[in-house]
Amino acid sequence: MSDPSRLARRSLLTGGAVLGAGALAAACTSNAPKEDAAATQNVASGGDNDKPGAKVTIGFSAPAADHGWIAAIAKNAAAQARRYSDVTFQAVQPTNDINQQISAVESLIAKKVNALVILPNEGKQLNQVARKAADAGIPVVNLDRVFPDKLSYRTWIGGDNYGMGVAAGHYIGRKLKAGNASNPVILEIQGIATLPLTQERSKGFADALATYGYKVTARQDAKFTVESGNQVAGNLLQAHKKIDAIWNHDDDQGVGVLAAIKQAGRKDLFMVGGAGSANAMREIKAGGVLEATVTYSPTMASSAVRIARLIAQNKGMADLVEQEVPQSITLASETVTRDNVDRYLPLGFES
């Protein structure tokens, strides 16, 4: 992800148009109660592959839903599975404890499920148990945080972390360049600094800014939580009396970041968010400090369940010529602004 020549790439989620259309339709036409509608808004249907086939059991493991994006991951996965009469969905207790997640996945292996969808707390630490599943003949769909050993998973699906940074860097770089900014103060608030996905986001951001002759002035991580976002932002605001722009990696922690900015009464800056939460999009629509967010959609969980079902049933993807599901699928990172926010708002998750 470190090659600057990749700045212009645009990754493609196969069937993304179908996914988006299905999600929009669900959001606009559902007669379900509000909570149920939110849980099912990011599901999709399409093609003969959706016709009932061999009955399969799909196991699912993810971290605890301690913030909006992870909560949306779990809801989307379960909602997608409910669409299929041939799928039994077995979700284990979500946890942020590595050893507990390993034990939970081992329980699914012991039950001999037909496929596994795993969003690991940390890819390296869960790699061994994923490999155990693969060696037992259970295909693993690795969601988001990647296992380092490709033999540990059949297919990986996730967001374009480098592309997120690139998108944020281009938005900030273009705006500052248009304003003839010289030596601007650009701050970056990461999620968890030790995660490879965070490092890829930072690399993309730095590479994009460099094309405008800019660089990050200060960087600090905020652990993906509202509380840490508020504390980190407050410290950065005190340390920098002049700020031109902030890129915040995560819209969940962005709730705290925005609160700190508003409390400090700072109007000398603009901010770009990350992931595409509904509350961030509402802030963008209202106008103010938050001008944009770059997507990292939890719809990937819906797609992961669909992919696991196809693999377990020995099917390929209907829109592809190839007979089998691809080894990796990367979602495109899209920039949401006031100009296009109404189109993306139905797909936003609640922080």
Describe these PLM feature segments.
Residues R266, F270-E334:
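Flexible loop/turn connectors
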Residues C28-A37:
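Bacterial lipoprotein signal-peptidase II cleavage site
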Residues Q101, I157-N183, S228-N230, G276-M281, ...:
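Hydrophobic alpha-helical segments within soluble ligand-binding/sensing domains
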Residues V43-G46, D50-N76, Q80, Y84, ...:
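Extracytoplasmic "Venus flytrap"
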Residues I118-A134, F205, A218, A222-R282:
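Hydrophobic alpha-helical
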Residues K124, Q128-G163, S182-V185, S277-K285, ...:
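Flexible loop/hinge segments that line or gate small-molecule binding clefts
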Residues D36-V56, I189-A193, L197, L209, ...:
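Hinge/cleft segment of the Venus flytrap/periplasmic-binding protein
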Residues M1-L7, G15-A26:
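N-terminal secretory signal peptides
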